[in-house]
Amino acid sequence: MERSHSELDAVIVSDQLASGFQDSPVLPRIWAGPARALYVGPGLDLSPHLNVATTIAVSLRQPFELRTWAKPGGWSPWRSEVISVIPSETLHHLKGLGPMAFLYLDPLTDRRHPLSRADLLRGLERLRLAGLRIGLDEAFAAFGLRPHCPRDARIARVVREVERRPDAFGRLQDAAALACLSPSRFRARFDAEVGLPFRRYRLWRRMAAVMRTIAAGGSLTEAAHAAGFSSSAHLSSTFKRMFGLTASDLLALGVAIDLSEDNVLSECTHDSQPQVDTARGA
């Protein structure tokens, strides 16, 4: 039986997760806009996971421990960090004590060239000066991150529709048809414009839809269905693979969700350029 939001808040969090919370009694907060996200709160002891979005992990007080998985070689040694960029689709294991910030860099809002170590350290200093009350815009500005929109109007059209209807486009062919491209051509164009395969980008935006439903007071089952998941169990397993904890565990910590406005989609409407593609059947 589906538990209500208030019941979920009363769930006892596992000792492993709670250890980080006890060392950082700051209630977690998530800012979720249409094309970027920020988490500020306890670092927690997360299970290994793969973020769809490139992530900047920032210690607001003491260092955190991080290791990554690669083929061949397996797990790297644990290393102590105060700030680290975790590339998209990188399996990693992070243990943080004390308050942390995680900036999730949606490809549509952030420059793609790598941030230098100097960029990261400047951003770290600005975040620490701002403290725990830093907001979405201020956090991203600390690293000089600027909007990036698809220049191909056909891809921008699909991006807008995914935002409006996150439960749609279960088949890549449907998105390709909206863009007036063949599936193979659409797959290549979307990856080139957005920097992420379509299915993975859609999954990222579905998670944003989950946050919106929960923020509006919906249950996990309602959030799952609104975002196109078959059940709350399906959502829970996917959420844990992406973030290292289940959605119910996150809610049990008393997380606040701020649906900050973000005008990147309207900017994409103006910035995108029509493209002539004579190879639709390619």
Language-model features: locations:
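N-terminal regulatory/effector-sensing and dimerization cores
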Residues: I12-S116
